[in-house]
């Protein structure tokens, strides 16, 4: 009887255990299924490239080209579907020097490269500088880049992509950001170098890198 009671209690708490343990990982999964899909695409593409080294006839070449085109079309469809699924999904931004005033999300636009299948996104939403900020960056242009930076569970930077820029002023030769200055978002793209980082990142921030 005691064992049955313990099993019943465990069953009651099982959903709670699963929701707590997996919550933060899926919640901050910036690119959804894309990293795994892109990794498989890159692997298959490398295999076809290896096969090309052994081409001996025109028929072999034609067959391999058809295989490559079919493989690319397959992954284009899958990656595009996953990219479109991210539309409207909020990007949770951790405490940083910018305030998100309208929820940020990725909206699929197109592919930067049709052969490499690097998806391009527009960033929706708005963010502004939280306070006056004196950077250590030399004042060169009237704006400086703002990056979307991802950190793993230990706080190590594992992902970084240029998200846009923010206007600055010249204060003693250094770039100065005035409070409430909006970030002007640029299209962002995802490529092979981002695969591992986007999978391990747990938190994201908007940052000016010095």
Task: Please place each PLM-identified region on the residue numbering.
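Bacterial N-terminal signal peptides that target proteins for export
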Residues: 1-8
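Charged, low-complexity interaction regions
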Residues: 49-64
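Short coil-to-beta strand junction motifs in C2/discoidin
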Residues: 138-146
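Bacterial signal peptide processing site
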Residues: 21-23
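C-terminal motif of bacterial Sec signal peptides marking the signal peptidase cleavage site
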Residues: 17-19
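Short, solvent-exposed, Trp/other aromatic-anchored flexible loops in extracytoplasmic proteins
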Residues: 135-137, 152-202, 209
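Transition segment at domain starts
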Residues: 67-122
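Short amphipathic, basic-aromatic surface patches that mediate peripheral association
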Residues: 127-137
């Amino acid at each position: 009887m005691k064992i049955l009671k313990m099993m019943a209690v465990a069953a009651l708490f099982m959903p709670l255990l699963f929701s707590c343990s997996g919550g933060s990982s899926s919640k901050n999964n910036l690119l959804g299924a894309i990293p795994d899909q892109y990794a498989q695409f890159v692997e298959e593409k490398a295999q076809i490239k290896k096969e090309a080294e052994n081409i001996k006839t025109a028929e072999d070449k034609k067959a391999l080209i058809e295989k490559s085109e079919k493989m690319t079309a397959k992954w284009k469809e899958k990656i595009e579907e996953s990219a479109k699924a991210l539309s409207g999904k909020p990007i949770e931004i951790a405490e940083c020097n910018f305030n998100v005033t309208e929820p940020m999300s990725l909206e699929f636009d197109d592919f930067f490269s049709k052969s490499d299948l690097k998806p391009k996104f527009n960033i929706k939403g708005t963010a502004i500088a939280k306070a006056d900020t004196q950077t250590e960056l030399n004042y060169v242009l009237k704006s400086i880049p703002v990056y979307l930076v991802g950190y793993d569970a230990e706080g190590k930077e594992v992902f970084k992509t240029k998200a846009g820029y923010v206007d600055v002023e010249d204060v003693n030769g250094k770039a100065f950001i005035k409070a409430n200055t909006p970030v002007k978002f640029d299209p962002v793209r995802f490529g092979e170098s981002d695969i591992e980082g986007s999978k391990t990142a747990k938190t994201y921030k908007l940052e000016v890198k010095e």
